[in-house]
């Protein structure tokens, strides 16, 4: 893949896999960058939600407003710096799922410099102290697809502590046994 292929891609998806439980095909932590010729359905739905919210709120950013509310309430806030926040997201699908998002909304991760890097390092350290060194995990950067006017990037961190079973696989319903508020409290102390 050359840089022009990457620039033309409908969606770019950066992932990091750690551990066999996280589906890693290699025995060491590794990152991969995918340049997809289409926008995945989950990203397209998110793009639509961002657009609908901006229309209803005269241009406000959905994730930007959620971040402001999480900072105000502090229940699920783990850490904050000048550029980004580290949260245990409301409605997390899995135990110890985390999100890093910019304090000021930006559509594309790649347009913002090292935003979130310090908090990502902090998040991984907190998870290691709480769950043990190098817990199996996936992380990915959700960034705006081509042509998305309203969007906001984020980094999702998903420790792989539970296995998907019949409920999750058969219905798409997630059963999270650790409340995000509990995760935030534990990781603030880690």
Cite the ranges covered by each PLM segment:
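HIT superfamily nucleotide-processing domains
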Residues: 1-190
């Amino acid at each position: 893949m050359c840089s022009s292929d990457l620039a033309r891609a409908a969606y770019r998806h950066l992932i990091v896999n750690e551990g066999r439980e996280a589906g890693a095909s290699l025995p060491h932590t590794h990152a991969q960058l995918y340049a997809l010729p289409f926008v995945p359905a989950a990203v397209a739905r998110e793009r639509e939600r961002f657009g609908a919210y901006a229309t209803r709120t005269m241009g406000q950013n959905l994730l930007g407003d959620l971040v402001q509310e999480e900072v105000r309430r502090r229940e699920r806030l783990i850490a904050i710096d000048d550029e980004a926040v580290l949260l245990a997201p409301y409605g997390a699908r899995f135990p110890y799922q985390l999100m890093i998002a910019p304090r000021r909304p930006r559509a594309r991760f790649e347009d913002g410099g090292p935003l979130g890097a310090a908090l990502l390092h902090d998040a991984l350290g907190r998870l290691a102290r709480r769950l043990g060194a190098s817990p199996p995990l996936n992380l990915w950067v959700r960034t705006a697809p081509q042509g998305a006017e309203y969007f906001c990037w984020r980094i999702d961190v998903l420790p792989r502590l539970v296995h998907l079973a019949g409920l999750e696989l058969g219905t798409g319903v997630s059963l999270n046994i650790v409340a995000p508020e509990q995760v935030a409290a534990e990781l603030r102390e880690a």
